[in-house]
Amino acid sequence: MNRRNFFRFSTLGLLAVAGGALFARRSNASAYYSGPISDHFDGVRFFNPGGSPPGNFMGLLKWRFNGERATWPENYPSPFPFAKPEMRIGGKDIRVTFVGHASFLIQTAGMNILIDPVWSQRTSPFSFAGPKRVNPPGIRFEDLPPIDLVLVTHNHYDHLDMETLKRLHVAHKPLFITPLGNDAIIRTGVEAARIKVGDWGDVVEVGSSVKIHFEPCHHWSARGLNDRSMALWAAFVIEGPGGKIYHIGDTGFHEGLNYHAARKKHGEFRLANLPFGAYEPRWFMKGQHQNPAEAVEGMKLCGAAHVCGHHWGTVQLTDEAVDAPLAALKTALVEQGVEESRFRPMRPGEVFDVPSA
């Protein structure tokens, strides 16, 4: 493929994961949500309080035409076999199974929770172009246990995969939990879905033992050309009898403000799932994706005993090599005095039984 066609297709495929939605036209009404103005909603679009917005269109062009993009292999196999999860994990135990990129299965308190599930081959609005996975999902879809909850952090294609949500609805009829506005998107593909939405600070109680908290993160959203930041993005805190899990799908570090706030509100975490890939070039990605050093600092700031690192090694969204996050993470852990065993760079199919406090 020549450079011009590569640019065209890769930019289309990155519409909602690395800046393509910067083409967005201004609108006087949100496509997804109508509600009162707040400290992070202007009546049409959501925003990061006190933070910088995503890079502009000229920055996108500069990056895509002039960036030094590493070539990923067509296959980057996981060292782990396909996982076959147990039906349920009860009580205070917490078991994490990594599906790939930003997709997790969390099992605790008898609940089976999927986060940002993606089983599709491409994280793109197109079946023929855009980021393509270089390893298969770590759990075969047919081997999933009964799924009770599906948490969707935001609407970028590498986190909200409509085809996967359709399959989950048919097979499991789960409850979907997602930030404001994303329910409208999900219903375009799964009209009969059970969905609960929330704003930052809201809580959804699930049964008698699990709560899902919506917390801020520094990011943005878009599915296409005219809906930039019209649906909210969020981190989640899963609170159960075994402690609290802090899950961030995507975030810029933003001086660690949200990590500080999470610890102040929730105390220390038994586990945090933190992104540490898709971060180059820094001049363009810094406001939306933290790098490995920032992820380690975030771990320390939020008081996480253990971290499952994600958002790397499955689909190429940005310029760094497929294994660059690993080397950068190892350096950051040494420089910041964190034991390597506490921050696990997850691979598809990997299973982690989280130690108790």
Where are these regions (language model features)?
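Catalytic core of the metallo-beta-lactamase
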Residues: 103-107, 205-269, 284-286, 290-294
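Active-site metal-binding motif and surrounding structural segment of the metallo-beta-lactamase
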Residues: 128-177, 265-273
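Metallo-beta-lactamase
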Residues: 5-143, 179-247, 270-276, 328-350, 355
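Divalent metal-coordination and catalytic microenvironments
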Residues: 106, 116, 154, 212, ...
